[in-house]
Amino acid sequence: IRYAIEKGAELVAAFDINPAVLGKDASEIVAEDYPKTGVCVSPAEKAEKILGSLKPDVCIIATRSTVAELEDIFTICAKHGINAITTCEEALYPWNSSPALTSRLDELAKAGNCTLTGVGYCDLVWGTMVTNLAGSSFKITKILGSSWYNVEDYGIALAEGHGAGFTPERFEKEIANINHMSEAELKELVESGKYVPSYMWNQNGWLCSKMKLHVTSQTQRCYPTTHSEDLFSETLNATIKAGDPTGMRAVVTTETEEGITFVTECVGKVFAPDEFDRNDWTLVGEPETTISVNRPATVEMTCATLVNRIPQLIDAPAGYVTTDQYPYNEYCVHALNTYVKSRNL
């Protein structure tokens, strides 16, 4: 909210499901001493009525992680012709994980003459940063990506979803069971919505689309991470014994007709004292190039990337349009409306 307002956007409505903030000025969500906005937080169930009445240029959605969870609000926005942009991780490139739902949303958005899209930290640090860097290569044969994050920062559900604190046997049974599936079986499971793959599943699809590559195969394998000494997890309120799973490495491998292979991984685990959030990307070829982003301000970068994408969202064609189809993101020095090219705001 703060980033959008300070870049010249006008806040006209805000919604939440948290009873503690309902009816309060939206400034209380932003910061304790933030100036009053004059906009009160409304219950999420009133979103359709209020949005349909106000018809804002853009709706920012920062709630959930899968497109299925956002189907209702995306549908509301499409119905009323409101452009929608979300930090939902899958929404960055849902064509290879929820193709049927994405196609339905695409049709609804085209009928409503508006655009739906997903952005965030991954849009830039895992996306345009990589493809822009590729412009300095003569030949690329493989792209390696690795993103580390501390599951202690995201609550018990995510920690357990990564197998932190599991026994090796439980990890193999509940998480690594997909390692024994064929590519076709895994694809069917992902597209059924019964299994949510690693963020890199969607990211590889985004990268291939941006680079105009044609995917021939894609698989994911999950492996436990371990530590040589006991580690105490504050989130789990338990000590993880040396050698037991501290989390998970989810490795996505994508092959393309053009001969470029992607091997990307998300490493989510209980960090040892000397570990930190990091992102490393290597372009293998001529020349070989590696870029690293250590200790990134993930939340701030997610919000800033979204706000800087708003003018491009407004200018984009109608439909579910992923950001690989957008121009490269840019830092908006001036008010957001001055970057909109398709109409005067």
Where are these regions (language model features)?
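Rossmann-fold NAD(P) dinucleotide-binding segment
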Residues: 47-58, 67-89
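N-terminal Rossmann-like dinucleotide-binding module
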Residues: 1-32
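Rossmann-fold NAD(P)-binding glycine/threonine-rich loop
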Residues: 69-71, 75, 88-114
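Short alpha-helices
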Residues: 110-139
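Short, ordered loop/turn segments at secondary-structure junctions
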Residues: 17-19, 64, 88-92, 121-122, ...
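C-terminal helical cap and adjacent loop that interface with cofactors, partners, or active-site loops
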Residues: 270-345
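Glycine-rich, highly charged phosphate/nucleotide-binding loops
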Residues: 32-49, 67
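Active-site-lining helix/loop region of Rossmann-like oxidoreductase modules
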Residues: 135-269, 273-277, 296, 303
